[in-house]
C-alpha cells in the first residue's frame, strides 16, 4: 500500500492491539519488510499477517532470499603491490607453467618461510585465473584462519569472494552453494569441506598451510558413517579432472609433499626470505627501532620506489627446563620466559604463549634426566590415562603400572605432562597481574563466531597475551606480537604417533613465525626437557632441510 494509505490504516487500527504495532513498523520503515524482520520487531506471526492481508491492510509476496555470510561486511579495497625480486622470480615461473597460452594444469609446492609473501603469490595466481574466465578455490586448514584470509582476498577482489564452512547454518550453506552454482562468486574460501563447492569453471586450487593434519578427516571426528578423505589427495584429483593449477603452500611442507617434489610430481617454488610486513609506508624510524630481529635492505622495490626491507626470522632461545629445576624454579615458566613476558608487556607489545598439546593425551617424564616412559616392546611413548591410573601403549595396547621412580636415574621427580591453557593463563596473572589475557583453544571457540571475535580482540590490542594450542600456530598475521613462548615443547614430541617429530617441528616453526612480523622485531623462547632432540634444534634454527634429512633417515631406519 502507499504511505498515505498506510497512515490512514494506522489511524483506523489505533484501537486494535494486534494490528497497530505492525502498521507502525511498516509505516516507520517506509519500504517492504521481510517477515522475519517484522516478526522480530513486533512478534507478528504468519496467521496474523494473512488476516491483515485479507482486510486489505497489507500485501504479502514470496521472494527468494539468499543468505550471504559476508553480507554487511566491509573490506578495505587494496591494490596489487610491486613484487619483490624473490616474489617476481616465483611468479614468473608459476605463470609460465600454469597460466600462459597452451599450458594445461600444473602442480606446485610453494615453500616459503613465514612472512615471505606467499599470500601475494596466491592473489596473483587468482587474478590470472579470473582473467581466463576461470574460478578459484582457496583451502585453509581451520575456520579460525577464514576471517583474515577473506579480508585479504575480498579486499583485492570485492564482491567476488564467498566462504563455506561448518560454522554457517544449514540454510546459509545451502544458499552459498546455490549462489556458487549460479556463478555469482568466482572465489570460494574455506576448510576442507569447501572442496565440494560447485565451481563450474574451476581453474585454480590453492591449499594454504598444506602440512596441516586438519586437511585429513579422521574417524573420531564424525563417527563411523562418514566418508573419510584427505583434502590434499582429493584436490590433486580434482585439479587433474578440471585441468586446474594446484598450489600447495607452506613454510613447513609435509614430508609426503616434499618427497613428492623430489620425485618430480610437484614443481618446487622457494621463497627463503621474510619480507618485513606492513611495509607500504614503513617509517625509517621504525626500521631502525627493530629490537631483536635484524633488518636487511635489499635492492627490490615497492610501489613507492622505496627499497625492499627484509627481516631475518626471529631468534629462538631454547631453555632446558631440567636446569631450571636444578636452580630451584618449579613453575611452568622459566626465568627467561617470565622476564621476557614482563619486558614485552611493559613495552606495550603483545605476546603469544603456546601449548603444544593435542586433546588430553599426556605422558610421563623424569624432570631430572628427561627420560620418557616407553613401551619396552614397541619403543613407543606410553600415554597416561588418569581414570584407569595406567600407562597404555597405543601401538600394541599393552598396559603398564605408573612408575614411582625414574627407571633411568632413580629420581622420584616424575611429572605428568599435559597442562591446559587455563593453568597458563592463571600463571600469567601471577607474574603480570594487570595483563589482559585471551585463550584460544577448542573450549573457548565452541560457539559460532568466537574465532573471529577472539582474533579481532587481539588484533585491536584489547588483549596483551594470547594463550592457545595449535590454532594460534596457523598462518595468523599479528604485527604487534614480539614474543612467542612455547611452554612445553615436549608434549607433542612424545605422543604415540610416528609423525610426532614432524608435527612438533612444524608447530614450533609455525608458532615462532608469529613473532617479528613488523619492524619491532621479535624473539622466541622454547621450553623443553629434551633440548637435544633434532626436531627442536631444527625448529630453533628455522632449518627445514636439516629436519627433513634427519626425519627421512629416521623413517627409513624404522620401515
Regions found by a protein language model. Give the residues of each.
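Pre-Walker A segment
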Residues: 1-140, 443
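Inter-lobe coupling/hinge segments of SF2-like helicase ATPases
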Residues: 78-84, 88, 92, 103-559
Amino acid at each position: 500500500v502507499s504511505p498515505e494509505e498506510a497512515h490512514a490504516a494506522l489511524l483506523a487500527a489505533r484501537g486494535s492491539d494486534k494490528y497497530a504495532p505492525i502498521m507502525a513498523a511498516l509505516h516507520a520503515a517506509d519500504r517492504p519488510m521481510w517477515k522475519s524482520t517484522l516478526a522480530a520487531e513486533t512478534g507478528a506471526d504468519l496467521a496474523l499477517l494473512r488476516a491483515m492481508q485479507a482486510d486489505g491492510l497489507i500485501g504479502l509476496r514470496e521472494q527468494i532470499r539468499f543468505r550471504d555470510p559476508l553480507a554487511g561486511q566491509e573490506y578495505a579495497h587494496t591494490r596489487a603491490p610491486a613484487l619483490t625480486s624473490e616474489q617476481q622470480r616465483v611468479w614468473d615461473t608459476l605463470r609460465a607453467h600454469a597460466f600462459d597460452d597452451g599450458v594445461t594444469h600444473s602442480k606446485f609446492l610453494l615453500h616459503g618461510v613465514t612472512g615471505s609473501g606467499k599470500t601475494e603469490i596466491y592473489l596473483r595466481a587468482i587474478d590470472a585465473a579470473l582473467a581466463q574466465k576461470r574460478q578459484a578455490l582457496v583451502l585453509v586448514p581451520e575456520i579460525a584462519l577464514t576471517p583474515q584470509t577473506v579480508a585479504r582476498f575480498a579486499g583485492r577482489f570485492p564482491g567476488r569472494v564467498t566462504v563455506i564452512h561448518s560454522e554457517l547454518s544449514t540454510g546459509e550453506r545451502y544458499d552459498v552453494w546455490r549462489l556458487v552454482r549460479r556463478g555469482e562468486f568466482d572465489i570460494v574460501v574455506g576448510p576442507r569441506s569447501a572442496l565440494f563447492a560447485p565451481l563450474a569453471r574451476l581453474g585454480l586450487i590453492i591449499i594454504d598451510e598444506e602440512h596441516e593434519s586438519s586437511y585429513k578427516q579422521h574417524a573420531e571426528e564424525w563417527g563411523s558413517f562418514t566418508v573419510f578423505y584427505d583434502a590434499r589427495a582429493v584436490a590433486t584429483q580434482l585439479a587433474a579432472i578440471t585441468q586446474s593449477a594446484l598450489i600447495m603452500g607452506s613454510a613447513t611442507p609435509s614430508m609426503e609433499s616434499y618427497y613428492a617434489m623430489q620425485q618430480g610430481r610437484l614443481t618446487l617454488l622457494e621463497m627463503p626470505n621474510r619480507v618485513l610486513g606492513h611495509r607500504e609506508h614503513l617509517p625509517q624510524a621504525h626500521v631502525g627501532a627493530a629490537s631483536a630481529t635484524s633488518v636487511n635492505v635489499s635492492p627490490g622495490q615497492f610501489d613507492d620506489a622505496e627499497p625492499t626491507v627484509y627481516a631475518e626470522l626471529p631468534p629462538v632461545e631454547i631453555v632446558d627446563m631440567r636446569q631450571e629445576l636444578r636452580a630451584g624454579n618449579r613453575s611452568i615458566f622459566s626465568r627467561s620466559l617470565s622476564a621476557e613476558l614482563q619486558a614485552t608487556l611493559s613495552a606495550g607489545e603483545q605476546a603469544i604463549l603456546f601449548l603444544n598439546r593435542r586433546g588430553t593425551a599426556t605422558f610421563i617424564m623424569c624432570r631430572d634426566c628427561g627420560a620418557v616412559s616407553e613401551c619396552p616392546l614397541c619403543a613407543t611413548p606410553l600415554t597416561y590415562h588418569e581414570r584407569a591410573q595406567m600407562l597404555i601403549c597405543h601401538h600394541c595396547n599393552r598396559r603398564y603400572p605408573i612408575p614411582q621412580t625414574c627407571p633411568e636415574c632413580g629420581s622420584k621427580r616424575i611429572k605428568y605432562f599435559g597442562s591446559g591453557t587455563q593453568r597458563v593463563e592463571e600463571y600469567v596473572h601471577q607474574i603480570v597481574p594487570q595483563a589482559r589475557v585471551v585463550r584460544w583453544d577448542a573450549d573457548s571457540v565452541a560457539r559460532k563466531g568466537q574465532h573471529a571475535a577472539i582474533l579481532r580482540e587481539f588484533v585491536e590490542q584489547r588483549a596483551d597475551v594470547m594463550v592457545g594450542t595449535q590454532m594460534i600456530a596457523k598462518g595468523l598475521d599479528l604485527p604487534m606480537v614480539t614474543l612467542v613462548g612455547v611452554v612445553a615443547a615436549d608434549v607433542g614430541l612424545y605422543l604415540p604417533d610416528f609423525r610426532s617429530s614432524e608435527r612438533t617441528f612444524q608447530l614450533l616453526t609455525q608458532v615462532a613465525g608469529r613473532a617479528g612480523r613488523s619492524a619491532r622485531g621479535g624473539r622466541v623462547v622454547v621450553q623443553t626437557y629434551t633440548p637435544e632432540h633434532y626436531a627442536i634444534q631444527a625448529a630453533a634454527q628455522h632449518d627445514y632441510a636439516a629436519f627433513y634429512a634427519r626425519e627421512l633417515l629416521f623413517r627409513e631406519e624404522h620401515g
